[in-house]
Every structure is written in structure tokens, then in C-alpha cells.
Design a protein with these regions (language model features):
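Bacterial N-terminal signal peptides
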Residues: 9-20
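Sec/Tat signal peptide C-region and signal peptidase I cleavage site
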Residues: 21-27
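Short, glycine-/small- and polar/acidic-enriched structural segments
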Residues: 28-156, 161-164, 180-186, 202, ...
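Short, hydrophobic alpha-helical packing/hinge segments within bilobed ligand-binding/sensory domains
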Residues: 70-72, 90, 170-173, 188-189, ...
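Periplasmic-binding protein-like
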Residues: 106-117, 198-222, 234, 321-328
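Secondary-structure end/capping motifs
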Residues: 224-313
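Conserved C-terminal helix/tail region of periplasmic/extracytoplasmic solute-binding proteins
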Residues: 298-335
């Protein structure tokens, strides 16, 4: 089913009201390349609406990637200006000194990532993973959580057959019956649960001090050269999340919002409402707070990096993770 731009424009009344009717005049078209993934979040409605392009005058190239590690590599090579990545690949990038900055928490992962075992595999607990084949995107938040889960159960990566796969590859391997378990997010998670059982979730580990999140990062060079774009972008991100917080009950199958999320993520529309509900989205005040961009996010990156180093996934730690996080753009957007 397709939906017209007027329907999405109606869904974005709250966003349009923030700015007025006309887009800013620009001398020449500027371009930004944005790397996104398949997480079900309100930003997909913004992407479909065209509001970012309209309000900034920039041409936005939306490029889909299979995992945060791929996004970080593309940013490192100069092919991407802004991208979505989980706290684990962001921590790895910061540890390597990549000149990027986390400026927005896309979501608190909460229960949106889960360890699922195939029915009939004999896996009833994390300890039962010993000797089994488990797929996960390496250096992702799911990988970080899986390694922590194994450690807590007295196992290591050597005790299981770990396969590094992107989400689409995991979906295909699960369909073929090639893997026994996976730690992954929707829409692959939704498909796996149809003939699998949830063994653990990200929320279980968050309650033990191993919280994970997805963030939006930009290269320091792009941020410095495009401050007005960054402020407008964050205003629109905040408006999209606020709209979901206020009207989320109406984001149902058949709504333009769900259609947009399904289109950009590749998820089935019927899976989108539950996919969105599995995450927690922060308001502007929470974003800028000391628990998040005001300090907590940097501490989370440090803790994640230390764990990654203990697992041999990074070789060095940054002396300070604060320079890789900023609340300044959120504060500017809130004015």
C-alpha cells in the first residue's frame, strides 16, 4: 500500500509549525550523505516527509547500511557525513580516534534487541549456547550484549561458533536453518521469534549496568561547517519523537507513519507498532541531561570500550570519551 505526500505532510503538522511556511534561501544546493539502518524509529517518518530537505535547502542522500560497523567505516573513508550507529561501534570508533561526534540519542535500546534460540535447538539458557552456532553483527550493540551474556554464564566466544553476519544475512541463515541462535533487532528479530524463543534481552543487561543505545553521529568537519543544518536537523528529530510520544497510539497499521517506517526499514507494516514500542525515545530535556549527552553517554562509551578491549575487539582506549559527545546541538535546537 502506498501513501501520498499530502498524508505525510498532515502527519508532520507539528514539525512544520516549528519553522514557518518557507524554506531558507540558499545560494547553491548543498548535499549531505546520511547513513541509516533498519531500526524502527520515528526518524523514518521525517525521512519520508521531505521536511529536512525543505527546511534546510540541502539535498539529502539517504543510504542504507547493514550495521553500525559499516556506517563507521563509511564515515572513516569520507563517504558519509552523518550516520546511525549503536553505542558499541561508536565506542570502537572513538577508541580509534575517528573524528566523529555523537549529538543525538536515536533510541534507548531497552528490549528492542534480543537473544533468540531456534525452537528445537535445545537452547533454554545462555549456558546452553556452548557448542552452538550463533550469528550476530560484529562490533554491534547486540554483539556487545552477547559477549557480556556469555561472560556472565562462564563462557567465552571460543565456546560457541560465532558468525559475523549483517541482519539480512542473519535472516537468510535463519530461514535456511543454518544457525541455532541470534542476538538481533527487528525486523529480523520479529521473523526469528516466529519459530524461536527469547532467551535474553538488552533490557536484562541494562538493569545490570550494561545499557546500550543507538545514536546519530556526524563528522566533526561537517558539524563545524554546517551549524545551521545541524540545529534544524535536531529540531526535526525532536519533533518526530515528540509526535510519536504524543500520538503513538494512532501509529497503527494503515497509518502514514507506519507506512513510512515500513518502507524505509523493510519491515512488514504489521510488525512496526510493536517494533517502535520496544524502544524508548528521549525528549530534548533528557537528551541534554547529565544522564545522556551531558555526561552519561560518554561514560557509557567508556564502559563499552573497556569491555570491547577486554574481548580483544579494540586495542587501545581513548583517554577521554567526552570529546566524542556533545549536547550543544540539542541545546541550540531547544532555544
Amino acid at each position: 500500500m502506498t501513501f501520498s505526500k499530502p498524508l505525510l505532510a498532515t502527519a508532520f503538522v507539528a514539525i512544520g509549525a516549528l519553522f514557518g511556511a518557507s524554506a531558507p534561501a540558499v545560494a547553491a544546493e548543498k548535499t549531505v550523505t546520511f547513513a541509516y539502518q533498519d531500526m524502527m524509529t520515528p526518524i523514518r517518518v521525517l525521512m519520508e516527509s521531505g521536511e529536512l530537505e525543505k527546511k534546510t535547502g540541502y539535498a539529502v542522500k539517504w543510504v542504507k547500511f547493514g550495521g553500525g560497523g559499516d556506517v563507521i567505516r563509511a564515515m572513516s573513508s569520507g563517504n558519509v557525513d552523518i550516520g546511525e550507529a549503536g553505542s558499541s561501534p561508536i565506542a570502537a570508533a572513538a577508541s580509534q580516534g575517528l573524528p566523529i561526534t555523537l549529538f543525538w540519542i536515536l533510541d534507548d535500546i531497552a528490549n528492542a534487541e534480543q537473544l533468540v534460540a531456534r525452537n528445537g535447538s535445545g537452547i533454554k539458557s545462555i549456558a546452553d549456547l556452548k557448542g552452538k552456532t550463533v550469528a550476530v553483527p560484529f562490533v554491534s550493540t547486540s554483539h556487545y550484549q552477547l559477549m557480556y551474556a556469555l561472560q556472565e554464564a562462564g563462557l567465552s566466544g571460543k565456546d560457541v561458533k560465532l558468525l559475523n553476519m549483517r541482519p539480512p544475512e542473519i535472516a537468510a541463515a535463519w530461514e535456511r536453518g543454518d544457525i541455532d541462535a541470534t542476538f538481533i533487532w527487528a525486523p529480523v528479530l520479529t521473523a526469528a521469534k516466529k519459530n524461536g524463543t527469547v532467551i535474553a534481552s538488552a533490557g536484562d543487561f541494562a538493569r545490570k549496568g550494561k545499557a546500550t543505545f543507538d545514536g546519530i553521529v556526524a563528522t566533526k568537519a561537517f558539524m563545524a561547517a554546517n551549524p545551521d543544518f545541524m540545529t534544524t536537523f535536531v529540531k526535526l528529530l525532536a519533533a518526530a519523537d515528540a509526535d510519536y510520544a504524543k500520538t503513538g497510539d494512532s501509529w497503527t497499521v494503515g497509518s502514514p507513519q507506519v507506512a513510512a517506517v515500513a518502507k524505509w526499514t523493510g519491515a512488514a507494516p504489521t510488525d512496526v507498532p510493536d517494533g517502535l514500542a520496544a524502544y524508548r525515545f528521549l525528549n530534548v530535556q533528557e537528551q541534554a541531561s547529565k544522564e545522556w549527552l551531558g555526561g552519561g553517554a560518554a561514560e557509557a562509551l567508556k564502559s563499552t570500550a573497556e569491555f570491547l578491549k577486554s574481548q580483544g575487539r579494540v586495542t587501545e582506549l581513548a583517554p577521554d570519551y567526552g570529546p566524542f559527545v556533545t549536547a550543544d546541538v540539542v541545546k541550540a535546537a531547544a532555544k
